[in-house]
Amino acid sequence: MAGYHDEQESINTAKHIWHSGGKWVVAVLVAGALGYVGYVAYQGRVHQGSAQAAQLASQVKGDAAKLAALQQQFPKDTATTQASLQTAAALFQAGKLDDAAKAYQWVLANDKTPVFQAAAMQNLANVYIQQKKFDDALKTLAAPVDATYQPLINEAKGDVFAAQGKAKEAGEAYKLALDKLPENSGNRQLIQMKMSQL
């Protein structure tokens, strides 16, 4: 009889817990499980989207129309940013400066990764130099950039001033670039050569 009484007491305790908040415990556990399943599904979609973006990015190969489609379909994917930078460089080499500028502008607007921002700024400034849009180049280079990449931006400013025939300003910008570059940087010689040609 004592075993029956202990068993009945356990059942009553379980009922009491269930009625006094046990439903919430179960609800929290179910919500947690659903959240986890949702997270796993989301990660699967992100991975699948990245794989699709990478596949499409490999097919762009300098085609501005394909790049625009990729940018629209996968605007937040790193593969899209990389394809934009590569396509912009190919378009620049082909003399399609307006299309190259659009690709660099897209990177500046859509990917805030410091290295991509710096690369797009520097290269967009080079496009503007070729188009003789010196004010646009300097405006592009005036945007904030991670301190790590400031020497590249200063060098690009020097290039803009040099293209305008402003030797003093170019020299100052190149000096700023040199001052912030590490001593073992391979870019130092190039900047020193540019300074000597002013």
Where are these regions (language model features)?
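Alpha-helical membrane and juxtamembrane elements of multi-pass inner-membrane transport
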Residues: 8, 12-15, 54, 68, ...
